[in-house]
Amino acid sequence: MNVRMLSANAVFLMLPALLAACSDAPRPPAVSFRIQNVPPVPRTMSQMSREVHINRDFMSPRSRARRAAHSMHPRFITIHSTANPKGDAAAHARALKRGAMGSLNWHFTVDQYRAVQHIPLNETGRHADRGGPGDMSSIGIEMGEVRSHNPVVTWNRSAKLTAVLMKQYHIPLRNVVPHYYWTGKNCPAPLLTNGRPGHKWSWFISRVDYYRRCLETRPAAAV
């Protein structure tokens, strides 16, 4: 999602239409990737959450975007990139809280150092497809593109966060999708190839899979 060119126009839908859209999410295609040839290091959910360094900085429930929200049990995780070379996670949190994004919002912004949570996970955001199934059924994660940050560190932190959310909500790896999946948009641009999922997206999914396996691996029993 390009946060420098955000529309403030809201689309208001009746509840039956929203519920219908929620059930109409198509099944994503399977992503082919090479499994990381590294033994998974066992982590608990709390350990990996600490590694992600999640900070809550919620928008006001009275904000324009949150007033239009609906309750949600997430079935997808949608990955975006900010297309903002200057704004880190804290800057995006401030922008959301002062209403600079209009009717748009999402659940997390991730940068090199932290992941900032903007809204509750049981609440819809407006980040994927203007009130369609992507908004109604997915957690939105924006990956920062700060010029002075190491992008690989940001991507790995995002992969860890994704793995934690997958386990928390029993979301299959197949349902971790780029913004491109919902609208064909070139987003997250740094992880797409010629505007489409390719080898870079497969690499990211392999990292998510690795951290997922870390959460599912039991520590070796003491001898």
Regions picked out by a protein language model, each given a short descriptive name:
Residues C22-I54, R147-V223:
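Basic/polar, cationic surfaces and motifs that engage anionic cell-wall
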Residues A65-R66, N105, E142-V152:
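Second-shell loop/turn segments in exported
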Residues H70-M72, M101, G132-G134, R147-S158:
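Solvent-exposed, acidic/flexible segments
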